[in-house]
UniProtKB/Swiss-Prot annotation:
<feature type="region of interest" description="Disordered">
    <location>
        <begin position="69"/>
        <end position="521"/>
    </location>
</feature>
<dbReference type="GO" id="GO:0005634">
    <property type="term" value="C:nucleus"/>
</dbReference>
<keyword id="KW-0539">Nucleus</keyword>
<keyword id="KW-0158">Chromosome</keyword>
<feature type="compositionally biased region" description="Polar residues">
    <location>
        <begin position="371"/>
        <end position="384"/>
    </location>
</feature>
<feature type="compositionally biased region" description="Low complexity">
    <location>
        <begin position="455"/>
        <end position="489"/>
    </location>
</feature>
<feature type="region of interest" description="Disordered">
    <location>
        <begin position="664"/>
        <end position="703"/>
    </location>
</feature>
<feature type="region of interest" description="Disordered">
    <location>
        <begin position="556"/>
        <end position="575"/>
    </location>
</feature>
<feature type="compositionally biased region" description="Basic and acidic residues">
    <location>
        <begin position="331"/>
        <end position="341"/>
    </location>
</feature>
<feature type="compositionally biased region" description="Low complexity">
    <location>
        <begin position="556"/>
        <end position="571"/>
    </location>
</feature>
<comment type="function">
    <text>Recruits the ubiquitination machinery to RNA polymerase II for polyubiquitination, removal and degradation, when the transcription-coupled repair (TCR) factor RAD26 fails to efficiently displace stalled RNA polymerase II. Also involved in telomere length regulation. Binds DNA.</text>
</comment>
<protein>
    <recommendedName>
        <fullName>RNA polymerase II degradation factor 1</fullName>
    </recommendedName>
</protein>
<feature type="domain" description="CUE">
    <location>
        <begin position="21"/>
        <end position="63"/>
    </location>
</feature>
<feature type="region of interest" description="Disordered">
    <location>
        <begin position="1"/>
        <end position="20"/>
    </location>
</feature>
<feature type="compositionally biased region" description="Polar residues">
    <location>
        <begin position="1"/>
        <end position="18"/>
    </location>
</feature>
<dbReference type="GO" id="GO:0000781">
    <property type="term" value="C:chromosome, telomeric region"/>
</dbReference>
<feature type="compositionally biased region" description="Low complexity">
    <location>
        <begin position="346"/>
        <end position="370"/>
    </location>
</feature>
Length: 757
């Protein structure tokens, strides 16, 4: 064993232990491939049996021999890098050519234009580089004084360094692509270039990170701002030179110095990256009339930015430009303040302005009913309200939902006018606190606002409030109904809940009062029975273990137990009527009485189960087999688990299957004749009623009333007699009806039948 393992582990060219086959293969392979050593080949030979496959793999290069891992030499590395750089430069050049083309068009088109663009944009606090004047001095936008100084210095340097600065960019870029462009070594150029490229990428990332923080009036403006703040001098100067001097663009002389070549296109790279975006903005900005479109675009931007502060900042400038157009409320001064201030103070001011705007809006909505004409005269504010209006309604509805109860108490006839100011004030408060709401509101500007809008708004608010009140009242009514229903019908809830509900709601009908106690107990047993999954939902469902213990007999919450009966449910105080058990009054009553109103009121079972009370298939609940047993066997089957009285299966007296009847027959008859609407539900009543009929019975028989113990014994005796009589009587019915072999025949509380399953 050790030899084998050694053999497999140590084939290192000494083929002494290798068997002759492998030796032969190795020799042929070394002849074919003289540069392969045995060490290289031996693993292959072990892996593939067939010589041909090995040869095939080696020749096709699928298999290579072990070799030293070498670092590529410096020359190789440089060559590779040069190739990469050249490719990169070609791509860049194509890009730049396109960009410069656009750029020249832009500059020629727009710098000749009126300087009003510069003022409005500067007013908005965007540090766009198009707000610079042609001579290279900058209107101080967004606090960029230091920046502009830097850029001017760099421009001067460039002008000193080169005879004609904005030489034809396209040609410069092309000439740079030629490797034989001058004295400098290509390696130096390439390395410096790659560094530049990395810087550019980093700065782009920086921009993207900054973009959500800075307030995005227009996407391009902020990107340019970011680039100017974050870039080193080279790129800033590039943007400056590319924009500031459009006049000399026409004169194009190719610059000769190699250094000029290296710097020039590199500088352009930033302009190339940043240029296409400003182009779009310029087109937008040139049409100040198209305020609606601008607003839409700005709102889209607002959706993109995540920070709510940015959203606020972004919404203000639009209204500011409109204000400037109509110089209405002297917000112009505010705006220019903002520009010199830092961004934080911008946001604070804008919040304040929003507050002002909303207060104005409130005043307007209050003035509205008196004078719609005023509103039209306030030209600019229309747009503000347009932006606010819908959000206001939203907020109102929100608040109404949160303050439902207050509204109910405060105003039963809701005329929204007196209330509205306070609500809008609340709305203002919530808006300042909650930036996200602000964002949602900005996304729905409506541009043309009819003067009547606030009236509509008020009407709508009134409508909302009325709706809310109606809903609340309905809910309360519904609750009351539910509770009554729960009390008069099924106790699906836990007993604690039930009692709470009873306390809360005065029962309207005396019937509910009567059944209240019964219900508490019913709830308890129902909760107990919920343990079996389907018992309450599906009346026909049974399974073998179901009837083992008295408390889980099918559908059996023992109806109106007598105090004398000890059972599992004595703890609940009162027994309760349940799905299939019929209140005592009907124990001996004819089956016709089954469907009378009394059963409906007395049993707490939900409506859908009630028709089942008249036991549908001849008293059996075998859901699927019922017809077989009933139709095909018209005779009764002997019932083996029965407790002695009668060997066939028999329903207990008058369909009341599971409850042993502890009353005298006299009592049964009387109670059947008693008012069917009255079913005893409380224990005190039970005791009285129970003792009354028995006493009457005895008095009729001319006997003395007995003391309780005797009475109990006599009741028990009578009960047995009655049961036997009932069993005998029912045997005939059973023979006709063909009762199923099953559950209904026994007394579940008696010991004798206990072990049947």
């Amino acid at each position: 064993m050790s030899a084998q393992s050694r053999k497999s582990n140590s084939h290192n060219g000494k083929n002494s232990r290798v068997n002759p086959e492998i030796k032969f293969k190795l020799e042929t392979l070394t002849e074919l491939f003289p540069d392969w050593t045995n060490d290289d080949l031996i693993d292959l030979v072990h892996e593939y049996d067939d010589l041909e496959t090995i040869i095939d793999k080696i020749t096709s290069g699928a298999v290579t021999r072990w070799d030293e891992v070498k670092k590529p030499s410096k020359k190789e590395r440089l060559e590779k890098r040069l190739e990469q750089q050249q490719q990169l430069q070609k791509e860049q050049q194509q890009h730049q050519l396109q960009q410069q083309h656009y750029h020249a068009q832009d500059l020629d088109g727009h710098h000749g234009g009126s300087s009003s663009h510069h003022h409005t944009k500067a007013g908005q606090g965007s540090g766009s580089r198009y707000s610079r004047d042609n001579n290279g001095t900058h209107s101080s936008s967004g606090g960029s004084n230091a920046k502009s100084k830097k850029q001017q210095q760099q421009q001067q340097q460039q002008q000193n360094g080169k005879p004609s600065l904005p030489s034809d960019n396209a040609r410069a870029a092309i000439s740079r692509g030629k490797p034989a462009s001058g004295g400098g070594s290509w390696a130096a150029v390439a390395s410096s270039d790659s560094k530049k490229h990395q810087q550019e990428e980093e700065e782009e990332e920086d921009q993207q990170q900054q973009r959500p923080e800075s307030s995005p009036e227009e996407p391009s403006a902020t990107t340019v701002q970011a680039s100017e703040t974050k870039t080193d001098g080279v790129e800033a100067s590039a943007s400056a030179t590319s924009t500031a001097q459009s006049s000399t663009h026409a004169t194009a002389t190719a610059s000769t110095g190699n250094a000029a070549h290296n710097e020039k296109p590199k500088k352009m790279s930033w302009a190339a990256i940043a240029a296409p975006k400003p182009k779009v903005v310029q087109k937008k900005q040139s049409s100040l009339n198209n305020v609606g479109g601008l607003k839409k675009e700005i709102n889209e931007v607002a959706k993109e930015t995540e920070t709510p502060a940015a959203g606020q900042a972004q919404r203000e400038p639009v209204s500011e430009t409109n204000d400037k157009a109509t110089n209405n409320q002297g917000k112009k001064a505010d705006a220019q303040h903002e520009d010199t201030a830092s961004k934080l103070s911008e946001q604070q001011q804008q919040q304040q302005e929003q507050l002002q705007a909303q207060q104005q809006e409130q005043q307007q909505t209050q003035q509205q009913d008196q004078s719609p004409i005023e509103f039209q005269s306030q030209g600019t504010n229309q747009e503000d309200t347009a932006q606010h209006n819908r959000p206001e309604e939203q907020k109102d509805t929100r608040e109404i939902t949160s303050n439902q109860v207050q509204i109910d108490e405060q105003e039963v006839a809701a005329t929204s006018e007196p209330q509205e100011p306070s609500q809008t004030a609340q709305a203002v408060a919530t808006e300042v606190n909650d930036g996200s709401k602000v964002k949602q509101q900005q996304q729905q500007p409506t541009v043309g606002v009819e003067a009547g809008k606030p009236q509509q708004q008020q009407q709508q608010e009134a409508y909302y409030q009325q709706q809310q009140q109606q809903q609340q009242q309905q809910q309360q009514q519904y609750f009351a109904q539910q509770q009554q229903y729960a009390q008069s019908q099924t106790p699906q809830h836990a007993p604690q809940q039930l009692s709470g509900q009873q306390a809360a709601v005065g029962q309207p009908n005396a019937n509910a009062n009567a059944s209240a106690n019964a219900n508490a107990a019913a709830a308890a047993t129902a909760a107990q029975q919920q343990y079996y999954m389907y018992q309450n939902q599906f009346p026909g469902y049974t399974y073998p273990g179901m009837f083992d213990s008295p408390s889980y007999a099918y559908g059996q919450q023992q109806a109106y137990q007598q105090p004398s009966q000890p059972s599992a449910q004595a703890g609940f105080g009162t027994g309760t009527a349940s799905q299939y058990s019929i209140p005592q009054g009907y124990a001996a009553a004819p089956a016709a009485d089954m469907t009378t109103a009394s059963t409906a009121t007395a049993s707490p079972v939900a409506g859908h189960a009630q028709p089942q009370q008249q036991q549908p298939y001849g008293g059996s609940f075998l859901p699927y087999y019922a017809h077989f047993y009933q139709q095909s066997f018209p005779y009764a089957q002997p019932q083996y688990g029965m407790a002695g009285q009668y060997p066939y299966q028999v329903p207990k007296a008058g369909y009341n299957y599971y409850q042993p009847q502890r009353q005298t027959q006299g009592r049964n008859v009387q109670q059947g004749q008693q008012s069917p609407g009255h079913s005893p539900s409380q224990q005190g009543e039970d005791v009285q009623q129970q003792s009354q009929p028995t006493q009457q019975n005895q008095l009729q028989n001319g006997q003395q009333p007995l003391n309780p113990q005797q009475l109990q014994f006599q009741q028990y005796y009578q009960f047995q007699q009655q049961q036997q009589a009932a069993a005998a009587a029912a045997a005939a019915a059973a023979a006709q009806q063909g009762l199923p072999y099953g559950y209904t025949g026994y007394d579940y509380t008696s010991q004798a039948s206990r072990g049947f399953y």
